[in-house]
Amino acid sequence: MRSGLVVAALVALSLTAVSAADNWPHFRPFAGVVDDDPRLPDTWGTKENVAWKVAVPGLGWGSPIVWGEHVFVTAVLGDDTRPKPGLVIEDGKAPSTPTYWQVPANANYRWMLYDFDFKTGKLRWERELKQGAPLTPRYHKNSFATETPVTDGQRVYVFHAPAGLLAAVDFSGRVVWTRQIDQPVTGQADVGPFGPGASPAIYRNRLFLVSDEHPNVWWLAAFDTQAGKPLWRIQEAKERGFGWSTPFVWEHGARTELITVSKRRVNSYDIDGRPLWHLNGLSGSTTPTPFAADGLLYASSGYPGAFRPVYVIRPGASGDITLKEGETSNEFVAWSNPALATYLPSPIVYRNQLCSLFARGLFTCHDAKTGKEIYGRQRIDPQASGFSASPWAYNGRIFLASEDGDVYVLEAGPQFKILHKNSMGEMIHTASPAIVQGSLIIRTVSSLWKIARTTR
């Protein structure tokens, strides 16, 4: 009887592993890098290797997520503005266009969740989750539906800070529960002008939300997935700054940690919200999401000015692990670089190379274990308008999506080499693709694409 239970458990574990490989449940799982798969194409266009393309009503920059035959995306209806490709703020330079978009006095927006069929692109269902006016203004290239949803395979969990909304929806489109997410009490915080962007994280039966878009207050909270019950919340004042970095659940041999890059530092908590360690020394604006590769944690912040630090951290730390003046490493900081971080895109580690994409169209590679430069900043295309989406990689190729809708394909290796570009003809902003089941699901400004080999 006992041996039968062991066999059953092993079968269940193997099925779980297969299932996980077939799904893309949240923002940048696997840190944007997937195993080699001959089914995945490296060339496509507006018609070549396009399995389907469908319109997505509304505006939103959340990334698509996939579970089985379901493709989920969010958007907001009523926001008729359409962002245009163009350089974002970087290197401390002011933009040439207005940066803030105020909410009209009579605004009435609808926050939507869409479920598309993975095989055909057909809309399975759509669900309105909330209606009303956004609580804050936004940056002119942001949206009021920028956060990526998450799923545990049974429900989709949607968080949109401009609506004060946290909701759980099952795979048939039924709203299971909703919860109003309170903003900091009036007087404790100024209203940030940029809008939010940090997506939720999920671990077992817990959802983690972070809010760092207010200039002088920050909070981190956990909720139960079953009913949306609040489990704990930390709220603190901070030195003026803004952040949009998604929290990261770091599982390693010693323990499970919740990592945030905010408040001008890297913070680690256990899943019950107890502080484990912190590292001071980030810049005032944090956007890239922390991630782990080959046993190391990568955290960075790249705006404003010349101070753009990257920190590579070993597991097992406790307390304050901040570098002393003049140090670039210590017991738990494997290496650091004060001028390597990007502003919007999150970097990737691929084939032992830390690859960094800068919004102004520059690309670098460093040894992921030591920080040694493999090659310095290389210009991708002088004609490109800017890069906001995070890179991804597979099959010895690195993919860089410009806001013009061009995806540049690089050969991974010690030399900078562009092989070709795939033009999609529609703006790509901060949405990263889902790479699953031998296909890519890419979100452009108005459409959702399934890229897959259609010819052999």
Task: State where each predicted segment sits.
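Bacterial N-terminal signal peptides
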Residues: 4-16
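Noncatalytic, solvent-exposed loop/strand surfaces
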Residues: 18-456
